[in-house]
Amino acid sequence: MAVSTIYSTQALNSTHFLTSSSSSKQVFLYRRQPQTNRRFNTLITCAQETIVIGLAADSGCGKSTFMRRLTSVFGGAAKPPKGGNPDSNTLISDTTTVICLDDYHSLDRYGRKEQKVTALDPRANDFDLMYEQVKALKNGIAVEKPIYNHVTGLLDPPELIQPPKILVIEGLHPMFDERVRDLLDFSIYLDISNEVKFAWKIQRDMAERGHSLESIKASIEARKPDFDAFIDPQKQYADAVIEVLPTTLIPDDNEGKVLRVRLIMKEGVKYFSPVYLFDEGSTISWIPCGRKLTCSYPGIKFNYEPDSYFDHEVSVLEMDGQFDRLDELIYVESHLSNLSTKFYGEVTQQMLKHADFPGSNNGTGLFQTIVGLKIRDLYEQLIANKATARAEAKA
């Protein structure tokens, strides 16, 4: 196993590093000789395998909740690095490390204002450094990653990130740069419709932050051109898309409380088999039995069908409506196949464990949980396949 010892510029003057155009952004690599720095006592061991997952979405679209569900599938709660910056955006568990791509902003809040660009604009982000560091982590090499401070809007000193078993990069641009995109083992896009996004933002910003309706509308409109140009097109590259739409069960519903959620799964993705309802490849419309699944108005409806999405063959599983009792979800789970669960009822168990998470009574929570289980299965298949390949190479 290779060993990498990582030092900051202050710790050691050395020419053995990869660097971007800014001298403060460096990835230090020491592969052969284990070293110990007495001041920092930093000895980093490379992970045997690191797989990289990309999660793209606009701000306020549920990325944080999704990450909490995903890390829970692998066990253990994700927390900021111990002893590090209290404003760090990074979350670390025993198996996963989640990096927020806001940390690769090249302009702080004041710089963006001066340059008249939003954080969605590629000119406000350092894709060279993003690529270098994601590649390094994927190859088992620790990095000194910058921190974007969401409280102050400034760029803080970097933090040391060690290579995990599973690296998740989440934010606005995980699939924007082709070099970064090619490093991903699996990718997800959260596609929230304009109507639902507006309803959610009103609920959050008016109720929790005291913003006016006019300011909320202005904020959404100001971001929309850059969102349409730089963020939304990434969904064509995603292996799975969770699409959140207004319900069709309530005519002219504008509140965004009852949702129609579609899980769009690309066919032919290595180590990933789409989930299906009843019969794979068929077109199914299903209203569950009211005696087995308690649902208040407007009820609940599932659909499943093969389809095409950006010229790719996909399978689409849809849920419209919401649950009243999560323990009854086992009835729905029993009719779904290819869930990649370890035991009967694992989806229901995961949903009950996080019943207080947003979306736990509708398709957003259900499909996030399912995708988390599929990612676990993908990871296990990847590791097993690489182990087999190594064994065959030695034979």
Curated annotation (Swiss-Prot):
Q: Which InterPro entries match?
A: P-loop_NTPase, PRK, PRK/URK
EC numbers listed for it are: 2.7.1.19
One Pfam family this sequence matches: PRK
Modes of activity regulation: Light regulated via thioredoxin by reversible oxidation/reduction of sulfhydryl/disulfide groups.
**Enzyme class, one word?**
transferase
Annotated GO biological processes are: reductive pentose-phosphate cycle; response to cold
Which is a Gene Ontology cellular component entry for this protein?
Answer: apoplast
Q: Which cellular compartments is it found in?
A: Plastid, Chloroplast
Q: In which pathway does it act?
A: Carbohydrate biosynthesis; Calvin cycle
- Got any disulfides in this one, which pairs? 61-100
Per the record, the major location class is plastid
Tell me a Gene Ontology molecular-function term this record carries. phosphoribulokinase activity
The record's catalysed reaction(s) read: D-ribulose 5-phosphate + ATP = D-ribulose 1,5-bisphosphate + ADP + H(+)
Xref: PANTHER family: URIDINE KINASE
What name does UniProt use for this protein? Phosphoribulokinase, chloroplastic
* Organism per entry: Arabidopsis thaliana
Lineage of this protein's species?
Eukaryota, Viridiplantae, Streptophyta, Embryophyta, Tracheophyta
